[in-house]
Structures are given as C-alpha cells and as structure tokens.
C-alpha cells in the first residue's frame, strides 16, 4: 500500500532516495597513505526485487561483481605541476618539491584533488603543510567521497569513452602498420581503441624560442636564483634566451669535493641533443680555463683538462681549490633550429672559510651559424644606458654608413682632470640614451695665432672626427631603412661684436624622444635631434699675450610623449528622413 495522494513515480523516487540515504549515513574513513596508493572503494547500489513493495527503503545489497579500478589515480594527479623537473611554488602535489622548497611555501594552491565527480564513490586527496616540523613537511590524506546524487555513475563498462581518441592520419610511413592493424579496413570497437592508444606523440623537428635544451638524460641545467639569492640547479636553459645571472651557494668547505655544482664536470659532461628527441648529440667543448687566486689575480691555463675541487689544509686554515666561480656557455645554432656547437669557459678559484657562502656567475649566449653578431641598443626601443646608433649618408639614395665601434658613432668631448683639450684629443665620450651629460676642457691661445685657424681647431674639437648626419629612431633600426632614420638638424648661433674674433664655445645636442607602442610595454623612439653650435666673440689679443678659453659640450634628452587619452566612439547618428506627407491629413 502507498500513501493516498502520492503518484507512483514519486513513490519510486522516494524509494531510491531512501536507498541512497542508507549509504551516506556512514562517514567515510580518512586515511593517510603514501602517494602510490591507487585503490579506491566505490559505493554500490543494491537491486530492487520485484516482490518488494514500492516505497519501502532497504540497505544496499552486496555488489554483483568486483569494483572497478579508477581510471584516474588521484594520488599521482597534480594539476598545478606545470614545470617539468622543477618545483612549482605552492604546488603541494608536485613530486619535484623537497623539504627545502616547502619552507618557502605559504599555502597549497590546490588543496584538494579529486577525480570524476559523476561517480558514486571516488577517491580524493587533501594536501596541507605541517609548518611545525623542522624542516616543514607535506601532509596528504586519501579519503573516500560519496556522491549523494541518485543519478551518479556506479560502474564504467566502456573506459575509452572517458577520453577523446585522436585518430592517426595515414601517411607513407605508417600506412603498412595501419593496414595490419585494421585487418582489411574492417574496424571494430576493440581494434580501434587498441591501435589508437599506442599512437606516438608528434615531436618537434627543431628547437623553438624558449624551449628547454634537451640532453641525453634530461635537459641542460642553468643554475639561477628562485625565490631568494640561493642557486637552484634545476632551472633549464631555454633556446635563444640569453641570460646572465648571479646567485649564492651555501657550502660546507669540508665537503667541497662532494658538491657537484662546484665541479667542472657538472657543466661540461652533458651532451646537448642537436634537435629535440634526437639521437644526434653535440658535446660541450671547454675552450678556456682561467684561475683566480685569493688576491683576485687571473691566470689562464694553457690546457683545458677537467679539474676537480680539492680540499687543501694550509696550517690552521682549509682551502678548496679548483672551485667553479663563473660559467659561460656559447651555443651556435642554425636557422633551422638545430644546435651545432657548444663552447664553455670557466673561471676557477680558491675558496676559504672567509668567503663562504660562495657567489657564482652563469652566462649563456646564442650565436647563429655563419653570421657576425651585431650588438643592438634596444629591441626595438632604446634601452637607457646604451649608446645611440648614428651614421651618415654618403650620397642620396644610399644606406646609412656606421662605424664598427658602436660607442663611437655619436660622441662628445671627454673631460679629464687636467682639463687640457689637446692632451686627449682623440678620446671621446659616447652619448648614452637617457643620460644627460656635460663635458668641457680648456684651450690655451697665444696672440700670434690667427683667429680663423683657432676657430677651425675649436670646431674640430667640438665635432670630433666624422660627426654623423642621422640617428636611428629605434635601437634595432637597420642601416638600409634610410627613410626611417632621423636627420640631425644643425643650428649655428653667433654673437657679433666689432673688432672681435668669433670662436665656437659650446655644442649643445638635444634629443627628443617619445614612448611608442602599447601602454603596457612602451618603447623609446627618437623623433628629433638638434645640434646647436654656439659661437662667442673674443677680443683680438696682442702679440705674445696668452689667454685661456673654455669650450664645452652638452647632451639633453627631452621626453615629448603625449599623455595617454581614452578613446571613445562617436554616438551613432540615424540618417533618416520621414516622407513629406507622413502626417497627412493632420498637418
């Protein structure tokens, strides 16, 4: 009998809800297990006998078969592990993290990891950190979660349906294999799944920008600082990413022979793969070894044999010799993304207990094969502190001619302590972007020198040798793009006075620049350059009298960037006219 007024369908649903309630009354046991635990206890539903009256709840019966093993092992699942072979900050499930890394964690970014939430029973891993332990430890709990929904999935009969199948495209390399696997192109569900699950992941045939350089066993390690100044050896070297870092390493001087990061072999023994996942290897060749003594003197060794750190007892002190202080990689690559050559230079030194902890320096540079490297002053915008790129145009229609010395393309006078213009006549100071500079010197004159000869000499001192006519707008401007270069505007100011000699006294260079591009990453662009030569009148001196004149040069940088303004679209205008007799016959 069922209560009066309740429809049969509602009674059936109530019966199902009562069956589920009997399962959810029991609290799942919380256990702490290792990360390799994969067994899951799935809740099951009993069957409803046909003789049982509807609406009568009962406890779930025993399962008709063995419970399935979860497809996803949540104990090894880590969604925040984004860096291979490297610890991710605040990722408590990252297997690459150690107790040293846990000491800088603030909390677990992913505290709970679960599988498919549609199953009736599923495993869940709860991660936390125990900061009371020394060192801090990672704590995880493997628990069972019960899904109270009556429409949950009890068992999965077709496991391949839980993931997408990426079919393999036939080509000349795999056509014969597909023919044997497909059995004459008569595919069933089992055979289709069997060969698609064994597909090889396509690998890149070349290195791309930012891709870690692979070695025969792992990747090329480039130590750097992570969250502090301490060195981290698990940082991969990225393709075409030039780096220069300094980091500190805490060492025990008595164990210096056992620390790999202090040995040359740690950096020279790996072999770089020519392309990713290739069998061709490029050995690292040691090009030079420089020995640094305790008093900072440098001596280059004639041979390039690999040296090992050695602990030496010098009286009451202990010294460790042949310790790696600086490492410089120079990798040569082709335009096809292949590494063809790897050179390595070392600076070895002697470490005493006075210099512990030890500071190391690491550099890596990439050079394209069959090319001559050209240093830039920015890419694309100028970088503060780098020299301005300048040159001259020999004839109309040609490109810009630049000197090979990038620090000698646009220069001013060089100030010395003696303030003598003729002492260092050929020495000049480069104009650096963003640096407002002023320099000068003194020139002694006698009355026997004619005014025109003195004026010509002063001009040569101010302009220097080969003063340019054009300045590059960006730090990476090409010499052949002549129309993009900014011409230098020359201005001459003079103050005439009767019975006087006109001598140039100052050269003032004004560089106007603006911020170009996105507001998030603006680039410095030069828009105007003016060179103003200022002349003054000097009275004619009598023969035999000496006098001293002061000449100076100055460079100023002016930011002419306009403030950013928000852009608004004009409101839409309806260009429509009503018919002439629209209001007829009322008007």
Swiss-Prot record:
Main location, first listed in the record: cytoplasm
Q: Which UniProt keywords apply?
A: Cell projection, Ciliopathy, Cilium biogenesis/degradation, Cytoplasm, Cytoskeleton, Developmental protein, Glycoprotein, Joubert syndrome, Secreted, Signal
Location of region: Disordered: 46-68
Residues bearing glycans: 36, 295, 528
Domain of life per record: Eukaryota
Q: Which family does it belong to?
A: Belongs to the tectonic family.
What's the stated role of this polypeptide? Component of the tectonic-like complex, a complex localized at the transition zone of primary cilia and acting as a barrier that prevents diffusion of transmembrane proteins between the cilia and plasma membranes. Regulator of Hedgehog (Hh), required for both activation and inhibition of the Hh pathway in the patterning of the neural tube. During neural tube development, it is required for formation of the most ventral cell types and for full Hh pathway activation.
What protein name applies here? Answer: Tectonic-1
Q: Which organism is it from?
A: Homo sapiens
The gene designation is TCTN1
């Amino acid at each position: 009998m069922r209560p009066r007024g309740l429809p049969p369908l509602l009674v059936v649903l109530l019966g199902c809800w009562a069956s589920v309630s009997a399962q959810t009354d029991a609290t799942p046991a919380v256990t702490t297990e290792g990360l390799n635990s994969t067994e899951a206890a799935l809740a099951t539903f009993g069957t409803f006998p046909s003789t049982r009256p509807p609406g009568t709840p009962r406890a779930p019966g025993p399962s008709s078969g063995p419970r399935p093993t979860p497809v996803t092992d949540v104990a090894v699942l880590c969604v925040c592990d984004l860096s291979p072979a490297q610890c991710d900050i605040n990722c408590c499930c990252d297997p690459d993290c150690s107790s040293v890394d846990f000491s800088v964690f603030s909390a677990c970014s992913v505290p709970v990891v679960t599988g498919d939430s549609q199953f009736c029973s599923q495993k869940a891993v709860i991660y936390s950190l125990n900061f009371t332990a020394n060192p801090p430890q990672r704590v995880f709990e493997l628990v069972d979660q019960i899904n109270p929904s009556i429409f949950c999935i009890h068992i999965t009969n077709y496991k391949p349906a839980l993931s997408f199948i990426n079919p393999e495209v036939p080509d000349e390399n795999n056509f014969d294999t597909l023919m044997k696997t497909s059995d004459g192109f008569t595919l069933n569900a089992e055979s289709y799944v069997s060969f698609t699950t064994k597909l090889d992941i396509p690998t890149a045939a070349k290195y791309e920008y930012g891709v870690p350089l692979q070695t025969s066993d792992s990747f090329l390690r480039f130590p750097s600082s992570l969250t502090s100044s301490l060195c981290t050896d698990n940082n991969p070297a990225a393709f075409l990413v030039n780096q220069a870092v300094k980091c500190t390493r805490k060492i025990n001087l008595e164990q210096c022979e056992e620390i790999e990061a202090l040995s040359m072999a740690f950096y020279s023994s790996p072999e770089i793969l020519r392309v990713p996942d290739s069998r061709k290897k490029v050995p690292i060749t040691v090009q030079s070894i420089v020995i640094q003594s305790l008093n900072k003197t440098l001596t280059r060794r004639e041979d390039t044999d690999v040296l090992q750190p050695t602990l030496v007892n010098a009286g009451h002190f202990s010294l460790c010799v042949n310790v790696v202080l600086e490492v410089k990689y120079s990798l040569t690559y082709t335009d096809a993304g292949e590494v063809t050559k790897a050179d390595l230079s070392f600076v070895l030194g002697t470490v005493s207990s006075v210099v512990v902890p030890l500071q190391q320096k690491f550099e890596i540079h990439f050079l394209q094969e069959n090319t001559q490297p050209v240093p830039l002053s920015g890419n694309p915008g100028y970088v503060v502190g780098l020299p301005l790129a300048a040159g001259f145009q020999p004839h109309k229609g040609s490109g810009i001619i630049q000197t090979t010395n990038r620090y000698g393309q646009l220069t001013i006078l060089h100030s010395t302590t003696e303030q003598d213009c003729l002492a260092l006549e050929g020495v000049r100071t480069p104009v650096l972007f963003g640096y407002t500079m002023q320099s000068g010197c003194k020139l002694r004159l006698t009355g026997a020198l004619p005014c025109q000869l003195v004026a010509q000499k002063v001009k040569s001192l101010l302009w220097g040798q080969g003063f340019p006519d054009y300045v590059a707008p960006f730090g990476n401007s090409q010499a052949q793009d002549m129309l993009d270069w900014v011409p230098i505007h020359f201005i001459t100011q003079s103050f005439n006075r009767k019975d006087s000699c006109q001598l140039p006294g100052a050269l003032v260079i004004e560089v106007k620049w603006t911020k170009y591009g996105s507001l998030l990453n603006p680039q410095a662009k030069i828009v105007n350059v003016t060179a103003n030569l200022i002349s003054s009148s000097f009275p004619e001196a009598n023969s035999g009298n000496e006098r001293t004149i002061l000449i100076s040069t100055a460079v100023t940088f002016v930011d002419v960037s306009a403030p950013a303004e928000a852009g608004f679209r004009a409101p839409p205008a309806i260009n429509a006219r009503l018919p002439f007799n629209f209001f007829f016959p009322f008007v």
